[in-house]
Amino acid sequence: QYIQQVVNATIETDIPQYADLSIATARKLKRLLAIIAQSAPFKPNMTQIGGQLEVSRNSIAELCVYLEKAGLIGQLRTSTGGIQGLGKVDKIYLDNTALIYTLGNRNVEIGTVRETFFFNQTRSLCSVTTSPVSDFLIDGKYTFEVGGKKKRQRQLQSIENGYVVKDDIETGYGNIISLWMFGMLY
């Protein structure tokens, strides 16, 4: 309940005031967050989302930046172009796991929770982008694949600085790291 109230206040008051948005645009912002919450993480098609909300694709990108600055979503970009800010948005996540349970579907996939947690914790200290071979690339050189206890290393066999992040294990070994340890970064 409380988290939902904070989200509503952020969308209905804080962002519109900060960005000087109209009431109609604030409503579209709320609809955009609802679309993201039902699908996150997902590869955004800005044109398609813009069609649903009856705004341009550029407006969707701008609204997503407002949601990200407000701490409601995280945008995972490609590493192309060398500067993270210029990379194309590859996936959109809800900012944290509490938002998944507050705004998302009742049937939350544990893989979504794991990836969201990892992305949320690492991006506060590092540059996090998409990896061509796994889930995440950190600071342009460390590759991470996030999964459960039985996650294999197939994708990372030929990757230097490749790590498997596993949930439901107490301690790591070799290039395997326990997911809970990333909670210590924050």
Regions found by a protein language model. Give the residues of each.
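A structural signal for short secondary-structure junctions
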Residues: L86, L137-I138, Q157-S158
